[in-house]
Amino acid sequence: MFLMRFTERAYVNYTADDVRKSPNSAVRLTFSNSHFDPEVGSDLYNLHFDEYEYSEEMGFDGLMLNEHHNTPTCLGAAMNLEAAVLARITKRPKIVLLGNPLPIFDNPIRLAEELAEIDMMSRGRLVSGFVRGTGVESLATNTNPLYNRERFEEAHDLVIKTWTTPGPFRWEGKHYQFRVVNPFQVPLQKPHPPVWIPGTGSPETLVWCAEHHYPYLFLETDHQGTRDMMEIYAETARNFGYEPGPEHFGYLVRIHVQDTDEKAREVGRGYLEGNVGVGRIPLPRDYASPVGYGSASRDPRFLRLREQIRSDPFRVGGLDGAAYDQILESKRWVIGSPDTVIRQLREILSEMRPGILAIWTNDGTISHEDSMRCLELMGQEVLPALREIGEELELTDPFQKAP
């Protein structure tokens, strides 16, 4: 089992009242950047790099980054820059980017070059994930949401061809046209770095991933919904002649460890002011999913799954309707002493059977000191236990068995 560490890298130096007074009471897209203090931001970026360096020391297999725009809920607006820093200051763990929002790139060749440089600088440690991005990303970059999926798939095809086909060649697509494709920066890994796709349950993306044999990582999805989505992937995989295993699936869960359950529960409340934003104020629906962004498919499996996602009380409005105790009781977040965390994770791993576990260790108002203690306990007690559980349950990862 592949164990990687993640944090959203949220900025929380603002108030709920600030959000309510913003256009449409939104913490993303229209929340003014006048609330951002670059002095605080400078400290945060450097603290996050310190934590990622310590994560390597504690034995994580991978360091995961993500990207969002026009929001304080994630400071990763230029994730590839952060990845380049990690490529130089770390030596062993994979650098997992989940992921670059392909539809907003007008020049996918430039992206292919950036990622190739990161792969070379890290000496072949890049895992390149791609995403469609939220509606906010499309609106923030003036990208027509109607063509989001088309641009995602075409940009993906162009990046892969750029990595694998000697140039020069010409590209004449619907959304991208280049007379000469011939970058000298190509990845160290052959034929190209591994591609993983994260998401929260787009059925079309699940099918597309299975067609490409790409691992799909479920981002904090409910347990029943995750199993249903795995079945959509599995049905497609069988149609393409293979049976998916744990190496085709990953799962992201917030996991915070302290010396006692009481301490962990107290500290873990800091998550509530992380990627959901201070005040947990719901994002307007037309920001998250603008007209044209969603699918028009009438496949009954897809319709049923979409309804299940919409009715998930922990998803609607970004966890705004769920009390902290409810979240813990549902095991959507795993927070406690090492023994408590190991016990609960055994249950989750037995049920979900992912070959990749993304561990969201801290965010929001969780202090740097508490974050470092969490990572220390992870390295000393939790990660060794998880490796034993992974072997016992035969949770093969993509580096043990190619997807």
Where are these regions (language model features)?
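An alpha-helical appendage that flanks or caps ligand/catalytic pockets
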Residues: 7-36, 149-184, 225-354, 387-403
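Acidic (Asp/Glu)-rich catalytic clusters
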Residues: 56-57, 83-92, 115, 119-126, ...
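Active-site mouth loops of central-metabolism enzymes
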Residues: 31-46, 99-109, 191-200, 255-258, ...
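Glycine-rich, proline-tolerant flexible connector loops at the mouths of alpha/beta enzymes
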Residues: 62-85, 101-102, 220-221, 359-371
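Conserved, mostly hydrophobic/aromatic
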Residues: 55, 67, 86, 118, ...
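N-terminal beta1-alpha1-beta2 module of alpha/beta enzyme domains
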Residues: 1-90, 193, 396-403
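Alpha-helix-loop-beta-strand connector modules within alpha/beta enzyme cores
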Residues: 76-97, 378-387
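Short, well-ordered coil/turn segments that N-cap beta-strands
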Residues: 1-4, 60-62, 90-95, 121-127, ...
